[in-house]
Amino acid sequence: IWLPIQFDEQGVPFIEWTDEVNLSAQSEWKQVWSDEFNTDGLPDTTVWNYDNGFARNEEAQWYQKGNAYCKDGKLIIEARKEKGRKNPWYEAGSNDWRKKREFIEYTSSCITTAGKKEFLYGRFEVRAKIPVSGGAWPAIWALGSGMEWPSCGEIDIMEYYRIKGEPHILANAAWGTDWQWNAKWNSKAIPFTHFTDKDPAWADKFHIWRMDWDETAIKIYLDDELLNEIPLSETVNGTIGKGTNPFRMPQYLLLNLALGGINGGEIDDKGILMRYEIDYVRVYQK
């Protein structure tokens, strides 16, 4: 057995475990894909798709391609306030929330790897700086393909929004039940003060969200702090999903900045230009 022996300034030997153990653990993982966002302009269209329009959760923003762009080695997703822009889906008298809005008040972007990059198990790392203004709902997440939500499975590596007016960071997973579009959740909501009490400048900095996912569990970390551990033994779909386990099937990635809706809350839109910055997305497997 090789021991990590080092010597102090007096030449006395000692064993320093921490760095070596971390190095050994990291060396088990091999990077299989990444996007470093190093080319200015639109994100790589061979990897990323774009949501278009009003998408989900009665959110306020209209998703469009132009609000996501790469600059200076980062992906920028911007939420912008619009003025007098007509909703092309508008139908007077409609009960559909997507169609009954006459105007588009806000725009943003959601990019996904659906149909282009899917992964089964691995370590997923995203280094990002998130907006924390009122109404902001940034996310790093994953979905399965081939089944309706939630039987396809959803993993929320990161969500930020307000719960009863107080900001939280969330780490979740959802899967199917016996009722269509009804999910079972394993969710952890950590008060934002848990982070800002330690570092008042937390929101001004980049942080690393990580998911370690194998055939036994999903573990979600923020700056190496474990936020949630979800055993795959509990994530079995109900009858709608035919008893399958969505987290033993491939998932694709999504990055988005939503506003308002059922979770985002009241939007602080004074001169709004919210910016969600992603330094990189990296995927490792053993």
Describe each model-derived feature in a short phrase.
Residues 21-286:
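GH16 jelly-roll
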